[in-house]
Amino acid sequence: MQIYEELVRRGLIAQVTDEQEIHDLINNGKARFYIGFDCTADSLTAGHFMALTLMKRLQMAGNQPVALIGGGTTMIGDPSGRTDMRKMLTKEDIDHNAECFRRQMERFIEFGEDKAIMVNNADWLLDLNYIELLREVGTCFSVNNMLRAECYKQRMEKGLSFLEFNYMIMQSYDFYHLFKEYGCNMQFGGDDQWSNMLGGTELIRKKLGKDAYAMTITLLTDSQGKKMGKTAGNAVWLDANKTSPFDFYQYWRNVDDADVMKCIRMLTFLPLEQIDEMATWKDAQLNTAKETLAYELTKMVHGEDEAGAAQEKARAIFGGGSTEHVPEAVISESDLADGKADIMSLLVLSGLCASRSDARRNIQQGGVLCGEEKVTDIAKAFDGEELRKGVVLRRGKKNFKRVILK
């Protein structure tokens, strides 16, 4: 199976400008394509992960990726998919974020001679002459057409600044510049970027009389139509200091049953034959599928060792696995009363709660688990035999301890 057909089977393609041309280019390893990343934060997120894996798939098929760091366009802010204006960042913030992106992307994509290249659009956008740009590029854009673009429609009622209105022109200019300077003949991006990408192909056609192509990637949404990649309203980061490998693993381990196979098909590099077989799994087997998804993605982002440790930690906490990677809290015989220790004492001794009253409050609010079971009885106690084997306690989502009597 060739790469274009694989992308179709994995459900990754949303829209294309010229299907046959794109099909032939990427199947024959003739595409030099780019994907842009505006550096609005100091880390990539799970939302970017989709684009990174696409770049990897296409590179493995012989095509050459161009990773565009949006050091210049970030100063404007992309209005696509937003109902409010993005926070303005300083040049220093943007430069710092761009460097963070560079370091992270080098972990996923192979850069070097005749491999992937990385460019920053600040290198050409910041030196543009405004009058020259208006004369050379502005004449190629119809305001009427721009206002009909989906990326602007959502903002018209709340107000769209002239600054943001220029974003389409800047992104289109990126494609034009990359086509001229690097022979970049194709752009990939999220489905919400379609209007901006068409602007680039049109600019190249009008200015150079050449054909360039665009393809959008299917947005990763759950069964309710909501974008995936956030937990409790917070982004799932690829930086281990912002989202730990364990939390990253748990995010994917906890996807809904209805979403797990979609995620495996779109995000992992497992063979399609294996995925088709997994798609027949039901009931308890879906938990195995979720473990597979979480392990494969964590391995890609954080490495095999971290993925294995996260999996073992999750299994220890939620049952059935080694407790090697769960932090220990050691207690002694002197901590027992009549050969037992109650749950509130263990929460305090382990450092999971500051006091017995804090422990009581957490239990009453449903925030304490022993293994996989929620603790509801504040008088629950454990004898010496249980404690010598070790008891895994959890407070909230991120605080775990294995309490062991030694």
Regions found by a protein language model. Give the residues of each.
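NTP-dependent nucleotidyl-transfer catalytic core
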Residues: M1-Q193, L198-T201, K207-Y213, K226, ...
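Conserved nucleotide- and phosphate/pyrophosphate-binding catalytic cores
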Residues: I204-K406
